[in-house]
């Protein structure tokens, strides 16, 4: 399973990049879903695994089963996967693509802890800086902690940016102890 994910990742990332740049995330999602549904069928899996079936014949079968659900870009992807004997990792490609799509479309949740209450102008500026840095929409949840002395601590996902006076003092204390 881990090997299939490793093999599928570059394909999923390339398709996602193409879909994002062309503004066709939804279309690609449908295309990958259609191909994935076909590849999951036991009879199709047997054909894919059969060394006596030529890549040309396999391509014809997949294209005919998909019908109009497969546009030219989708056909090129299927052809590439067949030529590289990677069509069996389509479920993982589809899964990874959907994960990338979900990440792209979602809004980042930022936990902002400030030493003092932020006015709306300060919060808007902070959010716009975060949106530029992460290139995604950011929703900030703000709280106040006077122990920070000054500055802010921001947590987005597993990343923490601590520009508070308290954080800087702790970093200096740690450096001096080392």
UniProtKB/Swiss-Prot annotation:
Sorted UniProt keywords: ATP synthesis, Cell inner membrane, Cell membrane, CF(1), Hydrogen ion transport, Ion transport, Membrane, Transport
GO cellular component, one term: proton-transporting ATP synthase complex
Predominant location category: membrane
Gene3D superfamilies for this protein: N-terminal domain of the delta subunit of the F1F0-ATP synthase
Compartmental location: Cell inner membrane
Protein's job: F(1)F(0) ATP synthase produces ATP from ADP in the presence of a proton or sodium gradient. F-type ATPases consist of two structural domains, F(1) containing the extramembraneous catalytic core and F(0) containing the membrane proton channel, linked together by a central stalk and a peripheral stalk. During catalysis, ATP synthesis in the catalytic domain of F(1) is coupled via a rotary mechanism of the central stalk subunits to proton translocation. This protein is part of the stalk that links CF(0) to CF(1). It either transmits conformational changes from CF(0) to CF(1) or is implicated in proton conduction.
NCBIfam families (alphabetical): ATP_synt_delta (TIGR01145), PRK05758.2-2 (NF004402)
Name of the protein described by the UniProt record: ATP synthase subunit delta
Organism name: Nitrosomonas europaea (strain ATCC 19718 / CIP 103999 / KCTC 2705 / NBRC 14298)
Gene: atpH
